[in-house]
Amino acid sequence: GVLRDGTTVAVKVLSATSRQGVREFLTELTAISDIKHENLVTLIGCCAEGSHRILVYNYLENNSLAQTLLGSRGSNIRFDWRTRVKIAVGVARGIAFLHEEIRPPIIHRDIKASNILLDKDLTPKISDFGLARLLPPNATHVSTRVAGTLGYLAPEYAIRGQVTKKSDIYSFGVLLLEIVSGRCNTNTRLPYEDQFLLERTWVRYEQERLAEIIDADLGNDLDVDEACRFLKIGLLCTQDAMARRPNMSTVVRMLTGEKHFSVHRITRPAMITDFADLKVSSSQQKENETTRSSNMRSFSTTDETEPFSSSETPTQTSI
């Protein structure tokens, strides 16, 4: 849309006919209205009149990371290595701001490529706070119904419905692998052993062939050592044991090279790829909570089982 002064804006219209639509409107308004950060979208205004529920944001010229970097239609944008570093570090700083620099902290709950918008300078902006949760003082987690996007969901959140900062960190780890590899986290058109990016990255890491994950389209500015370091950070963020995942300010320092880390800390990631995994894992969780291994993984053959969506489709579906 265009305002009277000629300013181009992005208009988000939410459903006013469902309780979920109204709830997401209020959640997003509460979460984003009073905070400003270079790597978060800027709320310009809102409308809650009659049946209308509208949020107005600044317009971002280059769409989302899902459309431009990961989209199948291609893009005129050249995502060289330095641009990808800028995007990865920017998103990490935005999440660190939400988690550590405001009170109460905000857990986004839906960090994914389609919610990372790019301005004219390719500065990343985290968007869509409709699923966000405020973390009460002295609380370590919030219990809630599971919502989000399959492929980015932390297993402990999907299984137990406990939202923590580490849930966002897991999602960021998956996103980081996508940024370095230039591919979506799930692609069922590939041979089975290559369909799931997180598993493929772990296998190549164990084989000491991590460089094979890096996007082959990257040009002469590629720093292979730095790209492999980013992939290792992605694996750190997606470890099955929440306690082993670094906090976001530490992730920022790792990405910028200010903090070094030991590869001996990296343990096998966990992944849930369809709803059947949730049912199996939830049953196991109830039966054997105290003996659940930190190295447990769940894998399946599909990535589009409802009620979750594939990684390219925005969703706010609850189970």
What are these regions (language model features)?
Residues 1-16, 42:
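Glycine-rich ATP phosphate-binding loop
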Residues 9, 222-233, 239-319:
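Intrinsically disordered, low-complexity cytosolic regulatory tails
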Residues 25, 29-30:
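Regulatory alphaC helix of protein kinase catalytic domains
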Residues 44-52, 61-62:
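Short beta-strand micro-motifs within the conserved protein kinase catalytic domain, predominantly
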Residues 93-106:
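Protein kinase catalytic-loop region centered on the HRD/HxD motif
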Residues 168:
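Conserved catalytic-loop aspartate of Hanks-type protein kinases
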